[in-house]
Amino acid sequence: MIKNNCAVGIVAALLLWSQAVFSIPNSQVDLDISAESIARIALYYEDRPLNGKEFDFPLPINGISQKFENTSSFFHLIGNVDNAEIVFLENQFVLPQVFGGDTHINLDGSFIHQGVETDSTKKLRLPVLKNISQATTSNGVKVKFISEFLAGNYTKGKYANTFTLIVMPIL
């Protein structure tokens, strides 16, 4: 009987002790940590970031071709991915007359990368630089627009439109 009482006492003490252990708050915490970096690309022109959404690109008359024509300086892509594609959203480049007429100027648009001229309505793959200090003529791109006809064929007036350049990171 004494052995049974002793065993019951030990079991009761163990149960009370185990209950006390379970009532102590756990001092271990699991932290689930995660981070996500999204692709970022900035468009630079003449070694400066293009802030804002508009960029003026006048088309003067070229003294040799006698067409409305302009070729930009170099654009560069700066960001945290290796490559990106650029393309203009529009399939046609048309400058309507702003005031007093129905005349318009059709333009051909092109990209010039590493001396090769390509259609600007087709995607062009370009390197994305980590810093503007890496910019060279071989990793930049120029944009060129030229009118379909000689400037003298168009009615006198102002012609204007906005075209959208899309920059898409390649992940």
Predicted regions and their residues:
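N-terminal small/polar-rich segments of proteins
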Residues: 22-102, 133, 137-171
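Hydrophobic helical h-region of N-terminal Sec-dependent signal peptides
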Residues: 10-16
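Extended, solvent-exposed segments with strong compositional bias
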Residues: 112-136
